[in-house]
């Protein structure tokens, strides 16, 4: 008779334990019902990037002195810098500058170590193309001003899931949204 009683007691304990686990998981589900969704509907909604987001690299041709520091600090030797030495003024003259974003790992070393600050990271992250050769940007494509996510009124911008407090008198700008 005792083995039968211990079997019933084990069954009862397991039933209570299972009910407790189900109750705990249900409480977690209910606690998440009050939160905003994490996912967004991408083509129609875009999230605003943080201030230090490493997107497409912006290049200013006039500031570049062709020192090739960006090539030396790049872990994959990616930027291609073509220059010619002007003998009459004894300076380098930049002819061509290009970066292949199909290979770039967006580490930001080139931007950090550039002595003239001619390189900067933008908030632009839509670089997808159908042909990988279109990702090879020359100095004209790199010099193009970045498209702001906030400035595009055809889509709904989503600020990260945390509540961001922005004063109504300040214009909505990517520089003012830093409370991520």
Swiss-Prot record:
Query: Which cofactor names does the annotation list?
Result: [4Fe-4S] cluster
EC number of the protein: 7.1.1.-
The record's section on InterPro entries has: 4Fe4S_Fe-S-bd, 4Fe4S_Fe_S_CS, NADH_quinone_OxRdtase_chainI, NDHI
Q: Which reaction does it catalyse?
A: a plastoquinone + NADH + (n+1) H(+)(in) = a plastoquinol + NAD(+) + n H(+)(out); a plastoquinone + NADPH + (n+1) H(+)(in) = a plastoquinol + NADP(+) + n H(+)(out)
What UniProt keywords are attached to this protein's entry? 4Fe-4S, Chloroplast, Iron, Iron-sulfur, Membrane, Metal-binding, NAD, NADP, Plastid, Plastoquinone, Quinone, Repeat, Thylakoid, Translocase
Pfam families annotated for this entry?
Answer: Fer4_7
**Which biological process terms from the Gene Ontology are attached to this UniProt entry?**
photosynthesis, light reaction
Q: What GO terms fall under cellular component here?
A: chloroplast thylakoid membrane
Q: Where in the cell is it found?
A: Plastid, Chloroplast thylakoid membrane
Give the molecular function GO annotations: 4 iron, 4 sulfur cluster binding; iron ion binding; NADH dehydrogenase (ubiquinone) activity; quinone binding
Q: Cofactor: bound how, per the entry note? A: Binds 2 [4Fe-4S] clusters per subunit.
Class in the EC hierarchy, top level: translocase
- Per its database record, what is this protein's job? NDH shuttles electrons from NAD(P)H:plastoquinone, via FMN and iron-sulfur (Fe-S) centers, to quinones in the photosynthetic chain and possibly in a chloroplast respiratory chain. The immediate electron acceptor for the enzyme in this species is believed to be plastoquinone. Couples the redox reaction to proton translocation, and thus conserves the redox energy in a proton gradient.
Q: Which HAMAP family match?
A: NDH1_NuoI (MF_01351)
Q: How does it associate, per the subunit comment?
A: NDH is composed of at least 16 different subunits, 5 of which are encoded in the nucleus.
Q: Which family does it belong to?
A: Belongs to the complex I 23 kDa subunit family.
Q: Which NCBIfam families match?
A: ndhI (TIGR00403), NuoI (TIGR01971), PRK05888.1-3 (NF004537)
Q: What is this protein called?
A: NAD(P)H-quinone oxidoreductase subunit I, chloroplastic
Lineage of the source organism? Eukaryota, Viridiplantae, Streptophyta, Embryophyta, Tracheophyta
């Amino acid at each position: 008779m005792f083995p039968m009683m211990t079997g019933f007691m084990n069954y009862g304990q397991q039933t209570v334990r299972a009910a407790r686990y189900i109750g705990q998981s249900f409480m977690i589900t209910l606690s998440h019902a009050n939160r905003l969704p994490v996912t967004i509907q991408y083509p129609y909604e875009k999230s605003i990037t943080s201030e230090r987001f490493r997107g497409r690299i912006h290049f200013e041709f006039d500031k570049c002195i062709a020192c090739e520091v960006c090539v030396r600090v790049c872990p994959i030797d990616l930027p291609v810098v073509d220059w010619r030495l002007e003998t009459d003024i004894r300076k380098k003259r930049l002819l061509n500058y290009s970066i292949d974003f199909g290979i770039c790992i967006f580490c930001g070393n080139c931007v950090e170590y550039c002595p003239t600050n001619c390189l900067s990271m933008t908030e632009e992250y839509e670089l997808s193309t159908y042909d990988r050769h279109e990702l090879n940007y020359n100095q004209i494509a790199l010099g193009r001003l970045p498209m702001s996510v906030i400035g595009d009124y055809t889509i709904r911008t989503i600020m990260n899931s945390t509540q961001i407090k922005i004063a109504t008198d300040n214009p909505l700008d990517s520089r003012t949204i830093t409370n991520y």
